[in-house]
Amino acid sequence: MGQKVNPTGFRLGIIKDWTSRWYDDSPVISGKIKEDHVIRNYVQTRLKREKAGIARIIIERTTKHIKINIYAARPGAVVGRKGEEINNLSQELGRITGKEVKIDVVEVVKPEIESQLIGESIAYQLENRVSFRRAMKMAIQQAMRAGAEGVRIRCAGRLGGAEIARAEQYKEGKIPLHTIRANVDYASVTAHTIAGTIGIKVWVYKGEVLNQRIDAIEEEEMKRIKERRSDSGPRSRNDRSQKRRRRPNDRG
């Protein structure tokens, strides 16, 4: 059943981190989760016209302000001339949330191996009546050339305008879904065509990652073992001999 699990959720807390990095134990936590969803949708739709290529959006919160990290293939499109676009975006989000919003833009070095950008590129081509096979094969070739160790793309729906919906997928390299230390980037995108919607799923294997989280967990386990040993203390030879003598009597 490993193939049915979301690869990102399967690795959360080990080699993957949450996209909403804040903590709140108050009853209004549901409102903040909804607010994060609204922020992501607004940023995606707002920057889609600029063709910035948004790979992911990370939201951090404090008591006074909200910090948004936008990972973009074209950061210049997000910032704009003399920072006009980013200032306007922060003001618009400030009016929506009612808090001060700070935006940082991070450039995506290799957009060819970002699953979200691959899915959006294929969706754009399908909406413009490009052959789905051509779009999928081209995306896989570009990702493998850029350094990906494995790519799998699956399209499902009325492919090519067919009356009966079906699913087709192409794969190159390896995609280890059960190996937790394997850095598998996953995304799901929907293409809105004349014939109907087409679901696009993308898996990109970027290699194994031994994160500091794993090392930290191992260090904590070693500390616990040492503490248990120190609490129990070293046993003397007399204690051991007494236990050995007691064994026959206990059995009898």
UniProtKB/Swiss-Prot annotation:
Compositionally biased spans, kind Basic residues: 242-252
InterPro entries recorded: KH_dom, KH_dom-like_a/b, KH_dom_type_2, KH_sf_prok-type, Ribosomal_S3_C_sf, Ribosomal_uS3_bac-typ, Ribosomal_uS3_C, Ribosomal_uS3_CS
GO annotations of cellular component type: cytosolic small ribosomal subunit
Keyword Coiled coil: no
Domain KH type-2: 39-109
Keywords: Ribonucleoprotein, Ribosomal protein, RNA-binding, rRNA-binding
GO BP annotations, alphabetical order: translation
Annotated spans, Disordered: 221-252
Record GO terms (molecular function): mRNA binding; rRNA binding; structural constituent of ribosome
Biased composition (Basic and acidic residues): 221-241
Highest taxon above the source species: Bacteria
Keyword flag RNA-binding: yes
Subunit structure, as described in the record: Part of the 30S ribosomal subunit. Forms a tight complex with proteins S10 and S14.
Function description: Binds the lower part of the 30S subunit head. Binds mRNA in the 70S ribosome, positioning it for translation.
Family classification: Belongs to the universal ribosomal protein uS3 family.
Protein name: Small ribosomal subunit protein uS3
Lineage: Bacteria, Pseudomonadati, Chlorobiota, Chlorobiia, Chlorobiales
